[in-house]
Regions:
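Active-site loops and adjacent core secondary-structure elements that bind or stabilize anionic groups
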Residues: 1-192, 196, 217
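C-terminal accessory domains/tails appended to large, multi-domain proteins
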Residues: 146-331
Length: 331
């Protein structure tokens, strides 16, 4: 049966979408060298600079284009070069004077999937559940496979021991004071640029810690195996979807990861009642190591999946509507 959205086409029922999940080869599950939680406080900013994605920086500045080819654009190239030079000077000042601080925490835990849920276990015995992280599933009828992040974690009863990672990072500690000082001096330009640089450093930090997880914790990747360009293009094995990303649109799952790794205690990050991380230049999500794991978009879901997901999250459909309003089918 297909459901039709007035604006966005046809959707499969939840039952049909679940039948169309991908067939994953569970003989390829990576076995980690280490598990547990790892803290990275006051991380060296100079190590993050090479991982900054300047294309995204320019897009946020209103100058879309691929770096460094953007400099040759006949319309935007000159301005892009000027902004880049200014950003380099400010970035050097931030790094040299430690005007921002980067705190992060990652963890790797025994895990399994149970339907559309990811289950994390308390220890390697896998006898006691530590946490359940329900996931959403794509229902679009024009997709050959309807994906959920849970599809890339070995299922209960498979006999395969799998693992799931989590992360929470920020490179925005100190930004409020820094941007406030610039604004008090009448320098809104530098205040805006400092925020965008903190955003980019945060993403670079997430990339750096994901690389650490792949190389040191899972151990399926060698140090230096990928160039910076390859890392920014995400050519490596595994994914790190942050909550709020298209494959994990429910921001409330951040609270679960904060509780899992005690993020608010061991880092400078806090969380509001509306699941916004403070400072705002932060990212929080999951790390999946299976070579077939890939990013995708959940898109819109029907009322049946909304009710199922809400129940698995321990709430009701109306409250969940508030959390993911853009992902509901308009019947």
């Amino acid at each position: 049966m297909c459901i039709r959205d007035r604006d966005a086409g046809a959707y499969r029922s939840l039952a049909e979408a679940r039948v169309r999940k991908p067939a994953v080869d569970w003989t390829r599950v990576p076995v980690p060298r280490k598990t547990g939680r790892y803290l990275f406080c006051n991380y060296p900013l100079e190590e993050l600079v090479p991982l900054v994605n300047w294309s995204y920086f320019f897009s946020a500045w209103g100058l879309p284009g691929r770096y460094p080819a953007l400099f040759d654009d006949p319309k935007r190239g000159e301005e892009a070069r000027r902004v880049f030079d200014d950003a380099q000077r400010l970035l050097s000042e931030i790094v040299d004077r430690r005007l921002l601080r980067a705190d992060g925490v990652i963890g790797l835990y025994p895990a399994a999937s149970d339907g559309d849920d990811i289950v994390l276990y308390a220890d390697e015995s896998r006898e006691r559940e530590r946490m359940r992280l329900p996931q959403l599933r794509n229902q679009q009828a024009d997709r050959e496979r309807n994906l959920s992040l849970a599809d890339f974690v070995a299922p209960l009863g498979s006999g395969v021991k799998d693992y799931v990672g989590a992360f929470a990072v920020t490179a925005g500690l100190g930004l409020e004071e820094l941007a406030g000082r610039y604004r008090s001096e009448g320098d809104d330009y530098r205040a805006i640029m400092a925020k965008l640089l903190a955003d980019r450093l945060t993403e670079a930090f997430a990339e750096a810690l994901h690389r650490y997880a792949r190389v040191t914790l899972w151990g399926y990747e060698r140090e230096g195996q990928w160039s910076v360009g390859d890392l920014l293009a995400e050519k490596y094995q595994g994914i790190r979807p942050a909550f709020g990303y298209p494959s994990a649109p429910d921001h409330s799952l951040k609270a679960d990861v904060f509780a899992l790794m005690d993020v608010g205690t061991v880092t400078g990050m806090t969380m509001t009642e509306s699941y916004m991380i403070v400072p705002g230049e932060a990212a929080c999500g999951l790390m999946l190591g299976h070579p077939e794991a890939r990013n995708f978009s959940v898109g819109r879901i029907d009322s049946e999946q909304l009710a199922s997901y809400a129940a698995r999250r321990g709430t009701d459909s109306e409250k969940m509507r508030v959390l993911i309003p853009q992902h509901l089918i308009d019947m």
